[in-house]
Design a protein with these regions (language model features):
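Bacterial extracytoplasmic/cell-wall-associated proteins, especially those involved in peptidoglycan
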Residues: 1-158
């Protein structure tokens, strides 16, 4: 079965799909977001999924700061401090998110950041990711200043 190929239980798949659902703004990006998390799990990395920390904090925040992440460091849902998937779903995933969790893109993406338009910039290396984050900060700062910079070319700092 596909779950056996992925070395995941049904519960783990639903948990991963719930993270993909919470992270994605565009359904077309779900398989790429899923690939990042599958790749991180495969390589033993922390997932570092913002939606899981927001879940641990009890809900949305306008911005996720390191102090907030640290405040729930011991939570099993804090994927910045706890390895692997959290113990359960953080929401109800839709069919597209479940399909993306089952069938991630075959890319070696390890990182992504959100752009002001809600789409994501996917990268393979830390150097690429750091450049994307720097671009993101500038784009979000322009947006906060009321300067139209939401052309989709700059990602959101996460």
């Amino acid at each position: 079965s596909r779950l056996a190929e992925l070395e995941m239980s049904e519960a783990q798949l639903v948990t991963l799909a719930s993270i993909v659902q919470a992270e994605a703004r565009e359904v077309t990006e779900m398989p790429s977001i899923s690939a990042v998390y599958h790749n991180r799990l495969r390589d033993g990395w922390l997932l570092q999924a913002d939606p899981t920390v927001l879940y641990a904090l009890g809900g949305p925040r306008s911005r996720l700061l390191y102090a907030a992440i640290d405040s729930v460091a011991d939570s099993p849902y804090n994927t910045y401090s706890q390895r692997g998937l959290p113990p359960g779903p953080i929401g109800a995933p839709g069919e597209a998110a479940i399909d993306a969790a089952l069938h991630p893109t075959q890319e070696d993406f390890m990182y992504f950041v959100a752009r002001p338009d809600g789409s994501h910039h996917f990268t393979r290396t830390l150097a690429e990711h750091n450049r994307a984050k720097a671009d993101a900060r500038r784009a979000w700062d322009r947006l906060a200043a009321g300067i139209d910079g939401s052309d989709g070319s700059s990602p959101d700092p996460r």
